[in-house]
Amino acid sequence: MDKVLFLLFVLSLGVSSQPITDSQRLFSIAVSRVQHLHLLAQRLFTDFESSLQIEEQRQLNKIFLQDFCNSDYIISPIDKHETQRSSVLKLLSISYRLIESWEFPSRSLYGGSAQRYQISPKLSELMRGIQLLIKANQDGAEMFSDGVVPQLAPYGNYYQSLGEDESLRRSYELLACFKKDMHKVETYLTVAKCRLSPEANCTL
């Protein structure tokens, strides 16, 4: 199924007679895929939380609110108003960077869920789809290549620095951050897609 959807990305770019329709098709696939990942992230986080004691949930949530995610190093809109003012290319570039930041951490999600739900391959396919959208929306700008998005801040290897004795906290934060970032990407891609319809109301 993943290969079929990715093929649709490629075939859609090859049709030049209806550029708006093609872009909408590309965006529809990308939005659908990130919605699936967001729902999956929510389910995994909820399942993990339900396995904890109430006091554990409270303490972990308190720590998480004071901590940060790996992706916080990536410059992104601070609120819905800035999101709506951002260009399509900027939203696509940030979305790519957010998905890319999970290439390594996604392999360590709780309970072997990454392998069971094929999360890493799904992220990789979404990255390739977003890359195609970036190329299609550059309009003569420098081509996007080698997985590098300009004007985005670097990020650290935060998840690699946690010790084994912090495995519970690590699992909680990984799932919470994964859920948060998939929500961000879903929002950015949805707004970017909406921009292709001049008469649409893209208010968040």
UniProtKB/Swiss-Prot annotation:
Keyword annotations of the record: Disulfide bond, Hormone, Metal-binding, Pyrrolidone carboxylic acid, Secreted, Signal, Zinc
Primary localization: secreted
Organism domain of life: Eukaryota
GO BP, sorted A to Z: animal organ development; growth hormone receptor signaling pathway; positive regulation of growth; positive regulation of receptor signaling pathway via JAK-STAT; response to nutrient levels
GO molecular function: growth hormone activity; growth hormone receptor binding; metal ion binding
GO CC terms of this entry: extracellular space
InterPro entries the record matches: 4_helix_cytokine-like_core (IPR009079), Somatotropin (IPR034975), Somatotropin/Prolactin (IPR001400), Somatotropin_CS (IPR018116)
Chain residues that bind Zn(2+): 36, 186
Modified residues annotated as Pyrrolidone carboxylic acid in this record: 18
Bridged cysteine pairs (disulfide): 69-177, 194-202
Signal peptide: 1-17
CDD domains per record: somatotropin_like (cd10285)
Keyword Cell membrane found: no
Subcellular location field: Secreted
Function as written in the Swiss-Prot or TrEMBL entry: Growth hormone plays an important role in growth control and is involved in the regulation of several anabolic processes. Implicated as an osmoregulatory substance important for seawater adaptation.
Family assignment from sequence similarity: Belongs to the somatotropin/prolactin family.
Official protein name in the record: Somatotropin
Organism: Trichopodus trichopterus
Gene that this sequence comes from: gh
